[in-house]
């Protein structure tokens, strides 16, 4: 299964991260990054933007590739690969839980709740990228026909 996750963050040395409370199993009621399954025929970056909008109401035109997470057992539903994006923002935007999310909220990176899946690992990687400097995760746009 192919999924996407989005690490949206804003702030200074201790950024705030956008999390959603899951409405459905697995991990119903637990906090996670916005994300979900890629639809057949859908571009991965488009799926990330769609899931972010569906679950939080936040619409972004630009996302930066963070990494690929494929550790066996990361999802109890079966073998799943997540292509993960970083979305550095200049300020917190209003968000609202929707679709598969009961709630969406900004949380300080130093006081995160228990997270579903391997999202603590993903967030750790995102925070390293965030701390790297002024470009904070900016990457060149993807190549290919669009």
Please place each PLM-identified region on the residue numbering.
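Polybasic "coupling" helices that flank or enter modular domains
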Residues: 133-146
């Amino acid at each position: 299964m192919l999924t996407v996750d989005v690490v949206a963050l804003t702030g200074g040395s201790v950024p705030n991260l956008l999390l959603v409370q899951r409405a459905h199993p697995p991990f119903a009621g637990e906090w996670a990054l916005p994300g979900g399954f890629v639809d057949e025929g859908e571009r991965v970056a488009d799926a990330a933007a769609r899931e972010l909008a569906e679950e939080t109401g936040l619409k972004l035109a630009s996302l930066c590739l963070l990494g690929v997470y494929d550790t066996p057992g990361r999802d109890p539903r079966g073998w799943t690969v997540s292509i993960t994006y970083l979305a550095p923002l200049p300020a917190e935007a209003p968000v609202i839980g929707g679709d598969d999310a009961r709630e969406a909220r900004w949380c300080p990176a130093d006081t995160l709740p228990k997270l579903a899946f391997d999202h603590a690992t993903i967030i750790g990687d995102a925070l390293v990228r965030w701390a790297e400097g002024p470009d904070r995760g900016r990457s060149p746009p993807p190549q290919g026909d669009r």
